[in-house]
A protein has these predicted regions:
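A surface-exposed partner-binding patch
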Residues: 1-136, 192-196, 210-229
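Helix N-terminus capping/helix-initiation residues
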Residues: 30, 79-82, 154, 172, ...
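Structured loops at beta-to-helix junctions and adjacent beta-edge loops in soluble globular domains
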Residues: 55-56, 132-134, 144-146, 159, ...
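Low-complexity, glycine/alanine/valine/leucine- and proline-rich hydrophobic stretches
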Residues: 139-166
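A short, hydrophobic/aromatic-rich structural module that often spans a beta strand
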Residues: 153-155, 185-190, 207-210
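Secondary-structure transition/turn motif
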Residues: 157-164, 208-213, 222
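Compact, glycine/acidic-enriched structural inserts
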Residues: 163-187
Length: 229
């Protein structure tokens, strides 16, 4: 499977260039864990997503909007979510869709030029499955299993609290992994440190992946914009 070949290339690069991130990769997800996730979501995951999770089920330690573990992200500026955290993040948004003001929130959703008719102009959808997460904010890169009329099931999009305007990150997960591998080979995403406030109020420089003032969302949007303008 091409996705596994590309992901293996990325993991090899990670081992050689960002060892703190490599050491934070989690063991494989079991078939039972993957099946349970699909039942909970009510969607079948693309084979390439299952295959990658069956190699590394996210990270050993992970930072998300709900969890602070002072972890080195396994992706440039982003956390690689496990089956458990995919479910937890999806549940948070599923609960939001049950709130009385959901219609007002849905009206906040929009798409960038070039994504009209491909991604639904919503704030949230049960068919949006988070795979990669911002370590601090509830913002995600993930599967779109509920595309608009001209979209493709399994396309990769941005969504979340501050990502209410959507674009196509990649046509599928394999393509997203190839973008990831291409990006790290540019040298733009080195092993770095980030000044972080600890629970006792002190500050420390902790291992990080990518420039502290940059974000992988920007790289993905830059590629989308270049293709649509």
């Amino acid at each position: 499977m091409l996705a596994l070949e590309v992901f293996d290339g990325y993991v090899s690069w990670l081992r050689d260039n960002v060892p703190h991130a490599y050491e934070n990769l989690a063991p494989p997800a079991t078939p039972a864990e993957l099946d349970a996730l699909e039942r909970h979501l009510g969607y079948h995951l693309p084979a390439e997503v299952r295959a990658v999770l069956a190699v590394h089920n996210g990270q050993k330690s992970t930072d998300t909007a709900e969890h602070t573990e002072y972890a080195t992200p396994c992706l440039p500026t982003l956390s690689l979510l496990s089956t458990t955290l995919i479910r937890e993040c999806w549940d948070r948004w599923n609960a939001l869709r049950d709130t009385p003001d959901i219609e007002q929130l849905q009206d906040m959703g929009d798409v960038f030029p070039g994504a009209a008719g491909l991604v639904k102009p919503l704030y949230s959808s049960p068919g949006w499955i988070p795979l990669w997460s911002d370590p601090i904010n509830a913002d995600y890169i993930g599967l779109d299993l509920d595309p608009d009329v001209r979209g493709t099931t399994g396309q990769i999009i941005n969504f979340g609290r501050d990502e209410e305007r959507h674009f196509i990150c990649a046509p599928n997960y394999t393509s997203l992994l190839q973008i990831l591998l291409d990006e790290v080979h540019t040298g733009a995403w080195p092993a770095t440190e980030m000044e972080t406030e600890l629970p006792d109020g002190s500050w420390a420089d902790l291992p990080w992946f990518g420039a502290p003032d940059d974000h992988f969302f920007n790289a993905l949007y830059g590629r989308f914009k270049a293709q649509t303008t």
